[in-house]
Amino acid sequence: MGSQGSGGVPLVQAPYTVLLLPLGTSRQDPGAQSFFLWLRRMQALEREQDALWQGLELLQHGQAWFEDHLREAQRQQLHLGALGENFLTDLHSEPGRPPLAQIQKVNICLQNLIHEKELSRQQKGVTQPKEEMAQRGCTKGPRGPTRV
């Protein structure tokens, strides 16, 4: 979608149109000030949308990463369960795996971000219907069993 930024984070670039209108009035004109403030707010909203699209893309990559690591952890658990008490003969560390504390830290950051957004919605009196959340895949459904 875009080039890679620092740290491998994809950069989202959207086309912008510059609009120059000669107003023929002074800066103190209420109409000119109103238009300028409107235009500035529109630009801020465009930048916010760009950041949100980039965040959504990062979340999709993050979801795939979590799913891959979850499958790998389940595979290792099945393998260890199959070894039984002979697991000491098959001790090999996985150096490429992130530490549990790091995964938990990311989970807490995501949870805090989502929780803050939900609190602000509740304070504004805006709540999402359960049907809408289910359509987006945001349900808190049961997790799969852990096999040993």
Swiss-Prot record:
It comes from the Eukaryota. InterPro entries: Suppressor_APCD_1/2. Residues 120-148 are annotated as: Disordered. Pfam families: Suppressor_APC. This is Suppressor APC domain-containing protein 1. The gene is SAPCD1.
